[in-house]
């Protein structure tokens, strides 16, 4: 189950996640997408709270251009961090590989500019052992 968060207060997000966790089967996979909704200064503290729900991954917690913050989050949080809006081009994929600001990448054909660019992004990140 993928949950979009980061548009409400942290308390409201936590309440929503608690309600969802109460009704999901124990073996359900929870994926949390912040859609760049967290302020970098609060992200690690917020995501440590969210880790209580054992998400499979946390997607794009901060703004796409906050790659230094993404790197700090990736090092500080046990849950894998998935880059989405941070990687639209092969150059951004190379930057991800060099700086390791996420544990995996979400590749979308439309955002990448088509199949060829998406394959290039997958090749770059895959060669570095980052799942797509």
Explain the meaning of each model-derived region.
Residues 1-77:
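Metal-dependent enolase-superfamily TIM-barrel catalytic cores that perform enediolate-based chemistry
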Residues 48, 54, 65-82, 87-132:
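Shared catalytic-loop signature of beta/alpha-barrel
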């Amino acid at each position: 189950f993928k949950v979009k968060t980061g548009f409400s207060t942290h308390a409201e997000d936590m309440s929503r996640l608690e309600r969802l966790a109460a009704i999901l089967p124990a073996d359900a996979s929870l994926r949390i997408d912040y859609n760049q909704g967290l302020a970098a200064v609060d992200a690690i503290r917020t995501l440590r709270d969210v880790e209580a729900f054992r998400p499979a991954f946390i997607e794009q917690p901060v703004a796409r251009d906050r790659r230094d913050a993404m790197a700090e989050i990736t090092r500080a949080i046990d849950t894998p961090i998935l880059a989405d809006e941070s990687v639209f081009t092969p150059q951004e994929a190379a930057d991800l590989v060099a700086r390791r600001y996420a544990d995996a990448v979400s590749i979308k054909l439309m955002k990448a500019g088509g199949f060829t660019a998406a394959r290039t992004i997958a090749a770059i990140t895959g060669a570095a052992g980052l799942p797509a």
